[in-house]
Amino acid sequence: MDFVSKYMSCLSSWGLDLQPGLQSVGAAVLLATGGLFLASRVLTFVRVLLSLFVLPGKPLRSFGPKGSWAVVTGASDGLGKEFALQLARAGFNIVLVSRTASKLATLAEEITAKHSVQTRTLAMDFAANDDTDYEDLKTLVDGLDVSILINNVGKSHDIPVPFALTPEDEMTDIVTINCLGTLRATQLVIPGMMQRRRGLVLTMGSFGGLLPTPLLATYSGSKAFLQQWSTSLGSELEPYGITVELVQAYLITSAMSKVRRTSALIPSPRAFVSSVLSKIGRNGGSPTYSYSSSPYWSHGLMAYFLTCVLQPMGKLVVGQNRTMHEAIRKRALRKAEREKGKKST
């Protein structure tokens, strides 16, 4: 009752002297509101834990039968390569799309040697935005039972850089590859899925799309675009039985991240892709984002804390993000100077 006494004193100090009965009702309303708010937070966190650690995702076979096809963009390295390998292990034929023909050929040979599936390859540079390339992709997938599309192709900045200093070609490539490339590839593949009334469209997002990221402004903006686009697309395609999911990811060991050593927060491509494919349809650490997921356990806990506890758009969070990337930029520039000095000697 100490709370009620303090509540009544507070009302009196504001000149709001209510009748005792009304004071009790007001106190009860405040207690109930606070209790409901706390209970909702607890239930949300329990949902996150169940999604990350207990509940399974949709089985891959629900998207298409054995022998159907999965299209993987950005397939020659890192996450794209791992998606292709694990989907082939699950019995899907694989269409590999990436820039370097020799890498695609090597991966196709590896897949067919390990698994009894078919592969097809298309070497195309998404940065070129060449209509002929997309016509070739359409020709390649037309007539195939494409059950899964993995939109993995992407590009970031070489190092953190202020927007005013961002090279124009780098800025253009990021937007063209991350946004336009993903949209055009998806628009080619989904008509068949809509006709068959099943399928999975999985797009690689980033924490950069959740949190404004100074010194990676163009990349962050491109991933925020994909977040909104994918969520909208998910609602459009749900009546057709198609699952659309954007995967929100922190760092993963890859050429793009320039991180080589794994840790609790930074998984290998194999571990990350395994978590993604086993949790399709589960939000993981992103309970407030429909048609989205943070399935890897540490990324999910981070996403929950950042989006449900903190204010991701607030000055404090954005400022800390800027400070971190300013430090990364300084280290990268010092490293470049050292390497330049070694070459000159």
Curated annotation (Swiss-Prot):
Pathway(s) annotated for this protein in UniProt: Lipid metabolism; fatty acid biosynthesis
The entry's keywords: Endoplasmic reticulum, Fatty acid biosynthesis, Fatty acid metabolism, Lipid biosynthesis, Lipid metabolism, Membrane, NADP, Oxidoreductase, Transmembrane, Transmembrane helix
| GO molecular function ontology, one term from the record | very-long-chain 3-oxoacyl-CoA reductase activity
Write down a Pfam family by its short name: adh_short
- EC number, as in UniProt: 1.1.1.330
Annotated GO biological process: fatty acid elongation; secondary metabolite biosynthetic process; sphingolipid biosynthetic process; very long-chain fatty acid biosynthetic process
Active site residues according to the UniProt entry: Y219, K223
Q: State the GO CC annotations.
A: endoplasmic reticulum membrane
> Which regions span the lipid bilayer?
26-46
| Residues noted as binding NADP(+) in the record, renumbered to the chain | V71, D125, D133, N152, Y219, K223, I252, S254
The membrane topology term of the UniProt record is:
Single-pass membrane protein
- Reaction(s) catalysed by this chain's protein: a very-long-chain (3R)-3-hydroxyacyl-CoA + NADP(+) = a very-long-chain 3-oxoacyl-CoA + NADPH + H(+)
**Which HAMAP family does the record cross-reference, listed alphabetically?**
3_ketoreductase (MF_03107)
Under the heading PANTHER family, the entry gives: HYDROXYSTEROID DEHYDROGENASE-LIKE PROTEIN 1, VERY-LONG-CHAIN 3-OXOOACYL-COA REDUCTASE
Family of this protein: Belongs to the short-chain dehydrogenases/reductases (SDR) family.
Protein name, as recorded = Very-long-chain 3-oxoacyl-CoA reductase
Q: What species is given as this protein's source?
A: Aspergillus clavatus (strain ATCC 1007 / CBS 513.65 / DSM 816 / NCTC 3887 / NRRL 1 / QM 1276 / 107)
